[in-house]
């Protein structure tokens, strides 16, 4: 991590004041209030000789939250700063992150938050890339299904898919923080590489589409903007669009990658934790009752100046 930071600083000549360091989550159990990320914030600060904010999730867990998702406040920032200049107020703007797990943020206007008329709502809604990636890694030399190529070759086993959908009832309602260990790929055991990928991708898409249907605003036109690696999986994105559970009005103009609105989707997550680090420094909330389930809006993160 330190080498990566040093390389970026050397290449960009950025004068860094503060680094938000999340690390790699290796275990997360919201019910037991346990979360563990790889990465030593103290050592990183020492090596790069900069202030570091790390351990973002613990304070939320201590205050009754589930420790995730933490990015909604940043999703709300970019929705207000960039998206709502192009979209009129008749739109309900939702941001979906399809990473290992999929989560959704219903954004609101800042002035409505300030006046306490509305709150940001967010939650984990479904698996994201985790099932597809695990299957591909276990059954091939590839690490993931680039562009959904393998899934597009395969044929979905509808019987297995329907049984899996009955067995994995995620929501609605959507209350629990999800971890990749909440799911497994055993239900596609015995299928070919391609058929397994196709079945898992359609399973993921149907779970996501159920959530989109649940969270659509009945009083406004809904737009869903997608970030995270899953947006690059063409098969997955098309499967969400053609899903029988999908919002009827959903199409290729209102279910789109965030790049369509000038936002770099590969860096939303990293930018989010930079923003959370600043909010932590200012002791501003990073999690909220309607995003993580915490008892009250709380800040989070530990700042270290270890040099």
Residue spans for each PLM region:
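Short beta-strand-loop/turn "lid" adjacent to the catalytic site in phosphate-handling enzymes
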Residues: 1-41
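Short glycine-aspartate micro-motif
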Residues: 16-20, 88, 92-97
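A short glycine/serine-rich beta->alpha loop
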Residues: 27-31, 58-65, 119-122, 191-195, ...
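Conserved nucleotide-sugar donor-interacting segment of glycosyltransferase catalytic cores
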Residues: 34, 40-54
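Glycine-rich phosphate-binding loop plus the immediately following alpha-helix
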Residues: 47, 53-81, 94-170
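Catalytic phosphate/nucleotide-handling subdomain of diverse soluble enzymes
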Residues: 96, 108-113, 134, 206-298
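A contiguous, well-structured pocket-lining segment that forms one wall/lid of small-molecule binding clefts
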Residues: 141-222, 234-247
